[in-house]
């Protein structure tokens, strides 16, 4: 598994929430598995 650290200052912004969801979906699409921390 590959682990990638991600830091965002806030999640009360709709754009950042969509960004986080998209990153999670993309991470799950990799065959070896990527975990966003």
From Swiss-Prot:
Any one GO CC term of this protein is: periplasmic space
Q: Does the keyword Thylakoid feature in the UniProt annotation? A: no
Its domain of life reads Bacteria
- Keywords in UniProt for this one? Periplasm, Transport
Cellular compartments annotated:
Periplasm
One further remark on this entry is: The molecular weight of the complete protein is approximately 30 kDa, there is a single affinity site for myo-inositol.
Question: What family does the database annotate?
Answer: Belongs to the bacterial solute-binding protein 2 family.
Instruction: Return the protein name.
Output: Myo-inositol-binding protein
* Species of origin: Pseudomonas sp
What lineage, starting at the top, does this entry show?
Bacteria, Pseudomonadati, Pseudomonadota, Gammaproteobacteria, Pseudomonadales
């Amino acid at each position: 598994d590959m682990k990638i650290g991600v830091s965002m200052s806030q999640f009360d912004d709709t754009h950042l929430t969509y960004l986080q969801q998209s990153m999670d979906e993309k991470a799950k699409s990799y065959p070896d598995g990527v975990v966003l921390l």
